[in-house]
Amino acid sequence: MAPVYEGMASHVQVFSPHTLQSSAFCSVKKLKVEPSSNWDMTGYGSHSKVYSQSKNIPPSQPASTTVSTSLPIPNPSLPYEQTIIFPGSTGHIVVTSASSTSVTGQVLGGPHNLMRRSTVSLLDTYQKCGLKRKSEEIENTSSVQIIEEHPPMIQNNASGATVATATTSTATSKNSGSNSEGDYQLVQHEVLCSMTNTYEVLEFLGRGTFGQVVKCWKRGTNEIVAIKILKNHPSYARQGQIEVSILARLSTESADDYNFVRAYECFQHKNHTCLVFEMLEQNLYDFLKQNKFSPLPLKYIRPVLQQVATALMKLKSLGLIHADLKPENIMLVDPSRQPYRVKVIDFGSASHVSKAVCSTYLQSRYYRAPEIILGLPFCEAIDMWSLGCVIAELFLGWPLYPGASEYDQIRYISQTQGLPAEYLLSAGTKTTRFFNRDTDSPYPLWRLKTPDDHEAETGIKSKEARKYIFNCLDDMAQVNMTTDLEGSDMLVEKADRREFIDLLKKMLTIDADKRVTPIETLNHPFVTMTHLLDFPHSAHVKSCFQNMEICKRRVNMYDTVNQSKTPFITHVAPSTSTNLTMTFNNQLTTVHNQAPTTSSATLSLANPEVSILNYQSALYQPSAASMAAVAPRSMPLQTGTAQICARPDPFQQALIVCPPGFQGLQASPSKHAGYSVRMENAVPIVTQAPGAQPLQIQPGLLAQQAWPGGAQQILLPPAWQQLTGVATHTSVQHAAVIPETMAGTQQLADWRNTHAHGSHYNPIMQQPALLTGHVTLPAAQPLNVGVAHVMRQQPTSTTSSRKSKQHQSSVRNVSTCEVTSSQAISSPQRSKRVKENTPPRCAMVHSSPACSTSVTCGWGDVASSTTRERQRQTIVIPDTPSPTVSVITISSDTDEEEEQKHAPTSTVSKQRKNVISCVTVHDSPYSDSSSNTSPYSVQQRTGHNGTNTLDTKGGLENHCTGNPRTIIVPPLKTQASEVLVECDSLGPAISASHHSSSFKSKSSSTVTSTSGHSSGSSSGAIAYRQQRPGPHFQQQQPLNLSQAQQHMAADRTGSHRRQQAYITPTMAQAPYTFPHNSPSHGTVHPHLAAAAHLPTQPHLYTYTAPTALGSTGTVAHLVASQGSARHTVQHTAYPASIVHQVPVSMGPRVLPSPTIHPSQYPAQFAHQTYISASPASTVYTGYPLSPAKVNQYPYI
């Protein structure tokens, strides 16, 4: 689609060209004139404002423009029909699209200067051409200026470069191609030259207060950019400098992560400052207009809100005010390929908060904050008001407060939300324009002037432009209620509306000091969708999760693609004869234009065709976007995506090993019966000194036998961590267990911060026979391989010191397994950009078939409360098209407050005790419908808070309310710093939930996990969690399950926290308990509360390990599915240097049915079955689970 300009008060006359022109376009432009236009493009005043001349037209129906970013191949053989705009009779111009596949495509104009007195925003690629809502008065002094045809002019100085200055005087502008207003006289196909690039003007996009925007082709490439040519009028020169400085500051941040437009460079052309931006597709206003101003569903408003709030959060952290946030300045990046992916544009009105001046004219009127209208001091909160107005407009399809004047604006606000507070009105410098004080009263109060009074004073007639008039904002929840929702979906919609209105009221708080902040907005339930946890079976909820998929962190291709680009360069321009080119160092090139070459040797998959969709598979979680992520520059990141196309992977084996940073390798379509394996980057197992060799991947590791087909999955050893090239990356992205040789010689914090992690890892990957052992599996049985980690106890003379410190251990689980259902040829992307010292916070279920993008997405929630009482739940939501149930449990506690109190003083106490890591989930066969009920009741566990609780200096809060879904008991973490023993329950209705996290010196408490009752089957599960926002929320970042990260306290003195890898069955099933009765674990406190056995519910399977595990290892328990008559297990053979010798006992207590007693079946597993191992840290034991229904390939 190409621009559609409506409302031009002119007609078109077409002239044949004098000469043939060579350009980026190879087709001609045809213009169609349609009469009876309702919109007028004429008129520009001191603020370049335009209103409709027609009295009967609503004042907020401007025209829309849409532009294609496709670029035809240059063809000099085709002539151009030159287009010149003349003033004339009323009509509007419809410019058909410029097509890259047909010579009938259109090009706007020829080598003529083209100027249009349209009034559009600064950087809007598409601007409405009727109403300019930032305007104040109407001046119809001129419509269109005609420029004589002339060839492109390039003025050269002595050095041969284009004359470039930052600021010019009025005298200079008179002879530099500018008119009296300072606008540059644009010429079609003119070449704009920076010091490094040349840009050919293709077409005019719009005009704003500070200049105009043109669509340009970057010569020598296939890139289309938008160039904003600022006016060189003295009144705009200063603001232009401010905009350049702000863009230069933003260029140091990730434009994709923080959702603002990417600026490429700044240069001077004929004394005009030119800003080069990425080309975006369509603004939200035109999107609304294209949809006939129909209301936008909340499930689409949510991702837009989240992305813009993320941008405002970054601006607030930088002390910047956007000051012109409106639908026209929120651009859809690529609606067809990335639905509702938006970016904030137009920083022409932006300023630093320290330079904010009262009574400054800021913001478009519809979105103007009360403090601006009243002349109060203001800050970044004005942007939050604007965002509230924007989302209200998306919800209503019409502006909430469409005031034709500032009086109408404050009148609308006061009628709906009440008068501003007395102290605000009294302090406002412009209050008396709109309010009168009742002097007769002993307590004089402000009252709003009547429309007649205001008109009598100012001569401005009050108008009523509202489509909806609300007595209060709560009434908005009743409008535009959808009628196509039934049952639970309608309940979901109502709950969603309640949260939306709640957030909207906080955003539209008249008092700016009480207005919600961007961080609080991102943590609001409407954004985090915690209020939807009660409807896990709803298809509407699933759709909400899928729509939020766009909010995930994006791969920063700049680190690998643009290293050869010009760095940030600023040439000071003291005079008009000095060149100035400023190259912004922020993602100089879009990822789809340049990508690393495909290289199977480095596991790099570059696919320029689909790389624009290359997102992180880490789940978005609020306030995580504040993390500045740094990708390892030594390893190329893949840019392909399985959702678009499946390409053969570089390895044609049945087993694919995906190291961190290279996750998401697609399985070959010819290997449907094989394994698509994802390496869980959970815990580096360090058993040697820091001088260990970095990880090397040998081809022998990937040469596997053809395993039986079926929906099978495997979790590879988490110790396979590093590639050689990663050693140069300084930001640590893995949690590491302290090696024994290092624990006694070096402080943890120093080792954590000063060394690259690449050299600390055990080179166990160099053993060719690592996976050569063949695992015999039934073809119909899926395989789950669990990994449990434990640190071996180091015998020292300071055991008593460890005992005294044991109560300070913090139970922490910072990693979970990801069990997803996906076709073998559809592997989700798993690339991730990582920042040092940022804790993993969330997880994601990504389930999609081949050539589709069906993603279930969830994210953590950082609660606004600062208490230690936190809640977590396992969310089970349906995920299409696969009905397979996936359960993910997230547990990530941050104990920064306690960790900051003390630095580690004992190197011995950094070792962990023998602890068993368990995960319990329910598992049951699924069906193809979304109404399969999980009949397991919730178990309440109370009264155990004093049984095994230790005396901690900080105390424990043992009260938590809610329904338990899943509880994970992670291993103990012993450190010298004072940390509470905390174990947050995933269900809020567990009284004394912290009993499961209390440990004696040599005892480990076991917790029973109960499966919460859900009213429907689920194929995706996300664990939401609420955390208190500590003072270091900037260190939070979405967790990519295949690349978990390590958390550190802000003072960099806290101990390491090891991440645990868990595997969960793909079917919902009954809870299981894992009590460990062994001398090394001391007294067991299982706190079991058996659930009522329903006819379809299996018995609680109990696995016992009667033999002492000693100090040598741990075991991962996976249970057989219900209804299975035989419970067989095959142990994978691993080399002795990998696994411990761990007894695995599965006695007759493992029953296939709750009605079958142990006497009916003999013991199917021999007691004291040993797996050949050595004292490393992990055990790999696979147990068959429920039969596979479909040929799915879960990824871990």
From Swiss-Prot:
Chain residue ranges for the region called Interaction with POU4F1 = 752-897
Locate the residues binding ATP: 205-213, 228
Q: What switches on its expression?
A: During T-cell activation.
**Cross-link type Glycyl lysine isopeptide (Lys-Gly) (interchain with G-Cter in SUMO2), residue numbers:** 32, 953, 973
Stretches for region Interaction with CTBP1: 774-876
| Pfam families linked | Pkinase
Q: Which UniProt keywords apply?
A: Apoptosis, ATP-binding, Cytoplasm, DNA damage, Isopeptide bond, Kinase, Nucleotide-binding, Nucleus, Phosphoprotein, Serine/threonine-protein kinase, Transcription, Transcription regulation, Transferase, Tumor suppressor, Ubl conjugation
Q: What is its main location?
A: nucleus
GO BP term (any one): iris morphogenesis
Active site residues per record? 324 (proton acceptor)
Catalytic activity, EC? 2.7.11.1
Task: Return the Polar residues bias intervals.
Answer: 793-829, 938-951
Q: What does this protein do?
A: Serine/threonine-protein kinase involved in transcription regulation, p53/TP53-mediated cellular apoptosis and regulation of the cell cycle. Acts as a corepressor of several transcription factors, including SMAD1 and POU4F1/Brn3a and probably NK homeodomain transcription factors. Phosphorylates PDX1, ATF1, PML, p53/TP53, CREB1, CTBP1, CBX4, RUNX1, EP300, CTNNB1, HMGA1, ZBTB4 and DAZAP2. Inhibits cell growth and promotes apoptosis through the activation of p53/TP53 both at the transcription level and at the protein level (by phosphorylation and indirect acetylation).
Q: Per its record, how is this protein called by name? A: Homeodomain-interacting protein kinase 2
* Species name: Mus musculus
